[in-house]
């Protein structure tokens, strides 16, 4: 056994192969650890899925550990290869989650299992499961997959991308007199993010427990709120007003940037006051709640509470379900769809295009209009004291194009597969923004389980790319396409040389 996991003595691997293998191993270890914890929980609760979860998790965990020990890292990894490795790790978690759904018999069709696993790890509030029929172990696995997916998004946005000189302006890295940055280095950033995320989840669990959600319900709701995943367990716990208030506070915090939360914890109030993105976040929530209440004819305190809950669920892309308050005007679901598309603050667990990038686009449009009047104008784009480099501005424009392209492409595919235009557009936006739930024009909640399997399967790529913040996923796709193209070109040249020799 010792020799099995001993480091190989082979020469160092290439940058891409090392990153891909490490990513696959890390993804497998994360998913198998979650499955093992869920299996042990189900075993204690005398559930029927315990041994399937435990056996599948142990086998995949050992295989992942063996692969991790066999990898020999090169002296330097290329940035594109690291992003490819991150994408492979995420895909590995999704695929192993699919396997566990099938092994436990929770889902028998691989397409359903892939959709459910992708929705969980991408924190998309869509599900085809009957939660009342799930055992405790699988309930914990489904909610836990969201929590892991939310942590992946935070580590990617706050620790990994800034360390690779991508979106460095979005990270709190600079030290100074009296300043304690969130991310002075990649390792410190990961540790700070993990502590904040885990502590926030723990506080949410205590809050839900005090509000009366019950032990299991509190764990499920805490994981879903912190990760903005929107999965709700059996028994309709969100029908309780006290539980709703905890969810409202939790969604508000989950939609805020980790930098803001760090500054609150470390009592750095000046940085919070200077944050233009945080002010925009507060303005969006306030104006959106008033508009939604007006368009849904909200009356008493209960209806306004439910209106605020619904608006927060959309803006933060959490996707907790709430029935429409009163008769909805046609503009109400459009408002929620736009709110989900824009999303919360950058550096949060929420999805969507996100507010910092939206502010960057607005500032860019203003600058280009001013240049039409003053062609020699030299102006930098500044957001709340942060000066964006031209590379970051170009990346924001690229991400806007990619987001719109994914929404349009997904809408077209699911429309061809049978959804009407309004539902197809809503499904495309929510998949790309990792949000939910999808609503009809009258505000009625639509169940993903009622859609055909091809429709649900068509949403999976948008969910995965959306959770990976577009850029890393597209870099990975480009790297894979380049590798395939190079191999085909090499094979073509080899065949041409072989034909020359035969002559």
PLM region spans:
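Membrane-proximal intracellular helices of multi-pass ion channels
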Residues: 1-503
